[in-house]
Amino acid sequence: MLGGSAAFAALAGLILTSMTPIGPASGTEPLPDLVRDAGEDVAVVEVIVADSAELDRLVGTGVDLDHAAHANPDGTITAHAVVSDGEADALRARGFAVGKSLHDEDDTEAVLAERDATIAEAVAANEEFAEAAEAADISDVKIIRADYYTSFGVGYLSVEAKWADGQTNSSQLTIERDSGPGTEIGSGGTQNISRFVDAGVYLYHRGAAVVETRPDTIRITSPSGDTATAKVADWLPIDGDGAFGPNYQSDFITSYLTPTELYDRVKALAAEFPQLAEIVELPYETNGYRRHAQALLGSTTANRVGIDSVAWGHEGGNDLSVAFVDPGAADSPLSVSVTGDDLTVSLATDASGAITSTAAQVVAAINASPAASAIVVAYTYRGSTGNGLVSVGSADLSDGLSAPESVSRDPHPVYAIRIGKTRDGSKPGVLAYAQEHAREWVPPLVTIETAERLLRNYAQDAETKKLVNALDIWIVPSVNPDGGHYSFYDFNSQRKNMTNHCPLTGSADYNARNSWGVDNNRNYDTYSLFDGYDGASTSCTSGTYAGPSELSEPESSNIDWIAGENPNIKFAMNLHSSGNYFMWSPGAYALPGRVSAPRPTLEEESYFWGASSRILSEIKRYRGMSVTPARTGPIADVLYSAAGNSGDLLWYKYGIYAWNFEVGTQFQPPFENENPTGASAHAESQEFANGLVELMRVARDFETDEKRPSSKVVVSASAEPGMVDVMFDTSEAAAVFYTVDGSKPTYASTLYASAGVREGAETITVPAGTRINWFSVDSAGNVEKNYKPDGSGTNFSTTTANAPS
């Protein structure tokens, strides 16, 4: 059963989190620390700020914010913060208005219970069927569906069946077909169907194959010899299928999936479709779902002693125990002994028999003992001098990890599924990746749904076949498997990876275990914290900790490797949650002044907007959900700074058109929702898979675009005497290079730009009668009139900007 000591929903995508003390603002009294220890309950609450400057101040505190930061009619801004009661009090002390609670830990407990119930129900159904099939008169195989349909004149038979032994036996089932009414079964040939396993639970066998004639009846014989027959039904077309045909298959998601289950799904897909897909093990293994065993003895900062095992918890550290004992005699020396897995510290006493050992003395004694230091490391509490007297007590060391043994404790490979008929780098590439942030459970489902659609629709849907034939698609369902497992099994609010970079003089003790890790989406090497940009932290316990250096983490290094080693990748989607945002670069700015990374050109910005419109329209098609214009655009415009994010890496370092989904309105919503427009992981997986598939259509259209743009000059009266206002109008998203001195335009000429943030094209004011020469070029490199800007061509566009009559 999944769960955790601090189960909780709704946490962050590109978010700003801190577990470190924030120093006092102006005033004589120190402010309460903004800090959260393991075991504290957290909730999502509203924080209302006066304006964007106050939002930046809120971000600067390091409080854990989700992506909701929406403007109110009165000009204020409502943000959502993930806080404990103590953190809420600390925000109030800093002058912030903390409002109502939106989500609490019970929400995620309900989500996990829903997942457990779904899995248990499926297991029970399998067991019930297997038990019933033991009867001589009941077949151990049953046919669920047998559908015939055509696509572009080609006939297909799709079959779903359940086998009583399907939970433990991976054998395929063979289907025999007749050739139509009155013909013999077997005369129409055979086809195989394979197991569909989700979250470790067998659901059914499924598959589709081309058939020359429509069968009327099919038969399945199980490995035990039992049989089942069924009539074949016609699969009827439906209206409103968008770009895809009536036979398009979707909805392959039945529950939330842990990282292990995500990888199992893509491995199974690659094994089932070896001609179209392969698994790529990325070069950098994670640190692993593992920790050293720890104990913390004492009750105050001055007398606490931290104990860490030298071995990993699962490799023996969890077997250790420590005891601080009173020797029961006066004038006893401080001593340390080890018997097997038990460490005993006999505390020093004075002439009256009172304990005199301080925390610092106990730490020094343990670390000086060869036997003790071979198995543990001791330290005072968070940099304390350790001058408090130690109390008698004992503890068993624990790594605090609750996942079942099926979750590996070793350094974890990160896997991508690479999909395409041709996967040698010669086709344009698309990259989709999810779960940079551990607690975002819905985005990985979007990647699985997309992979399933691409592979299962290849045979019968012409549009899907075009995509798979034309593109080289990389899908990483979980960038951060360690953090993902920790979020499912231990601390549902976990945002970062699991690597502890905190020194023993800092927050390295057992109480701080839920605040360790690096924010993978702040660890990249483009417009990062280390470059002076805002929205990341140097604190090892901050939710936006950028790491000790750029690309220090294997999780971020893997994404950089994919982009660097595959220059054919031209488009990318980073899937996060939540907030229903759709964003692109620039994603970082420097303070003061919000000086952003370089903005895309007008042509690039226009292309981002145009492609986004297509993608968002397909998302809306599923159930009518619209991502609003206010939540669409560059990250720096619609949200706040996220220094060192992967979108900026892909766009600025590698020239990849890179977007960021923020899926849904909650981070761990119910899987199903009775409200058809409500928060639902299932519905969100479907609607955002629509958008991800549309990105692939955008990529294909980009590659096959050979249409040259056209453009014209629009002249209007100017407020300045003797001057005119000039704008360029293009037939599509295109860059315009122009001159106003009569010279030939080249790529070194002035580039027509935007008027400002989210404003559209600029207006150029020139003297009436100015000769303007120009050409346009679209995102695919098609130049207007086939003009050669760097050659001897003279067929550029030209006009005289005369005052309108």
Task: Name each model-derived stretch.
Residues T730-E732:
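Short glycine/proline-centered coil/turn motifs in the loop regions
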Residues W312-V338, N367-A372:
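Ser/Thr/Gly-rich low-complexity blocks that favor extended beta-strand/coil architectures
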Residues G27-G306, V310-G317, A348-D725, G756-E759, ...:
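M14 metallocarboxypeptidase catalytic domain recognition
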Residues M1-G27:
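Secretory targeting and sorting signals
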Residues G182-V197, A329-T339, P745-S749:
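Low-complexity "stalk/linker" and mucin-like segments enriched in Ser/Thr/Pro/Ala/Gly
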Residues T174-E176, A735-T739:
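Beta-strand signatures of extracellular beta-sandwich domains
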Residues P333, S337-V338, D741-P767:
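Extracellular beta-sheet repeat scaffolds used for adhesion and glycan interaction
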